[in-house]
Amino acid sequence: MKPREVTKLKMSVRTARKRNTIVAVTLMLTILAPMSAMAAPAPMNNSNLTYETAKKTVIEKAKLLTEAYGTTSLQYALIDGGEITVSGQTGKNDLNDKVPLTTNTIYGIGSTSKMMLTAAVMKLVDEGKIDLDVPVVNYMPDFTMKDKRYKQITPRMLLNHSAGLLGTSSGSAILYGDNDTYAHDTFLDQLATQNLMAEPGAYSVYSNDGFTLAEILVERVTGMSFTAFIHKYFTEPLKMNHTKTPQDIVNTGEMAGIYSPLYKGQLPHENYNIIASGGIYSTAKDLVKFSQIFTGEVKGILSNKSVEAMEQKEYRRGMWPEDSDSSMSYGLGWDSVDLFPFSAYGIKAVTKGGDTLSYHSSLVVLPEYNMAAAVISSGGASITNQFIASELLLSALEEKGIIKERKPEKSFGVPVKADMPKEISKFAGIYGGNNSVTKIKINKAGQMTVSSLTAPSNPVQEYTYTSDGTFVSDDGTEKLKFVVEKNGNTYLWSRSYISVPGLGQVAFSEYNAEKLKANTLPKEINAAWAKRDGKKYYLVNAKYTSMLYLNATSILPIQLNKENPGYMSNNKITGANAAANLLQIPGTAGRDTMDIHFSKKNGGEYLTFSGYVFASEEMVKPIYSGKRSATIIQADGYAKWFSVPATAKGKVMTVKLPANGAFAIYDQNGICINHSVVSGKNVVVLPENGRIVFAGEVGSQFEISLKK
């Protein structure tokens, strides 16, 4: 689950409690001890079980997701002892309801793809072709980075998120109906220009790039494409007939329909072209078939030794908060190897979730009981799918008599105020994490407030100091503590229990922010950044089929905050044209860091990070408001941006498109009102003070005509 989803989930649930409604939670989700009585793990005869409780429960909760929590459609399956005992689907597929959902409807599974990559690496470990603890450069001599510590990175570090890579290099990877391999093919070139965020192995922080590098490692060692490898060794032996990648021939009519609040119709097919990181397509039934590798039901694919190695507490190899109930505790590939609430019953559960812009998935496996559940969806979020998957398994465990009764939901209780030591006040200040900046105030009475500088409209959160040295929220759902780690940095440790009406409860425990150190800038550097404050920069190097054009992430505002001088968001300004993200936070709060650079070219300023290039607003010229004009994509391949002057407002623009090009139009609020790849429309009324982007291959010409 992405960190922003966790943060929004916490805030939304609290707001919902205050309002006594699930509406606040719905808004967020549409964005995003030993047990009392437990039998010893052993195979059971399931012939007399009906799974009626599980079936009834999943139908009710799946209906709730599609009716109240923003999920368009979802599909689910439960496997027990090698038999798929529960499966189904609900929701809307196509707009006209002409194509029904079935158990064979194919969905993207996002980062759950990482488990297939991890299994691929471990198979090569079984064969003696890869050693988890031998540097990657031994297998790939052409793998280089700007930061020379890259030579320490091992395959294990790629799979447990501890390699220290910056995060996600996904330029032109997420496309509509386009399986272009550019992001994969140029990935090593991108890494060659990057630094590391930390010493390899220092701590585990979620990294898509680690798995993309591991994908290429598999290809180099085997001489096969990743797609060919997983089909030969996993999907074919397991009869996962509906599991594909963007490099396969996929019948788009078999794919679940995807939608966006920004467009009224059904969107084109989504291709996530860094495959091992998040690009595999599958069904819930196929995913639970795949889970049999991890329950031992299927032999000859992975050794027991490799399966057990994947389930070890890899997160404990580096910096991490003390163990507590959580949904995040990395193994090899797995998001958690000790998933709550199963841990409360003394049951080992491992899980992996995934989210793309359109699709979401959750796979939960109980290795000791030969059981697994998978839930995948169009719309929604992986965390809500995890609720359903967990409920499927808990209901089945009840019916089997393994769980005698459900445990009550957990809470830290209403805080009882205690006298706060004076030295605690020193922890007040500005904290960075989750791609956001937070201000923490602590008064002498032991009251702490947490407010967002990044999103000032968010409500201020209040906490009370208690006798165990922690601050607890008024509703008892979250406990915060300041921790000074061995590296000298101060972290805000958050433990929380989040209950979502009608769905269940999840737990989180992580460092969610790091205290930012003061950064006083010389006058000339401060002046250079002050000129950028409030400006907008426009994406110019995304392919014309990119999904980013619709989602308005193609327009980037620069916003500095007077309360956080010397920083751009949580990036420390290191020069007139550079800002580095120096945060070192394990888990998810420190993921996807980026070093930002500015440069002058063609009479304008460009901003670059993570492979993306943005042009300053000075380079956006008014579109010609006469009857006819044209624009051509130049040799650099950069998209051409234009503004809508008052003389063109309200006019009808018709664009004659080249074979390999598209355009998008945005209103004055930066909302996309037409992306030609999505709508198929080349005629649009120009909005007041809007923006237009033309993108395509080098030499592509767009012929433009305007009329009243």
Predicted features and spans:
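Catalytic loop of the DD-peptidase/beta-lactamase superfamily, centered on the K-T-G motif
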Residues: 40-84, 231, 270-708
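Sec/Tat signal peptide C-region and signal peptidase I cleavage site
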Residues: 35-39
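Short, conserved catalytic-motif segment at the N-terminal edge
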Residues: 47-109, 129-131, 138, 146, ...
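Residue-level signal for well-ordered, solvent-exposed loop/turn and beta-edge residues enriched
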Residues: 2, 83-84, 129, 260, ...
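Active-site SXXK
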Residues: 56-62, 76, 82, 106-136, ...
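Short, surface-exposed loop or secondary-structure junction motifs
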Residues: 83, 92-94, 148-357, 361-362
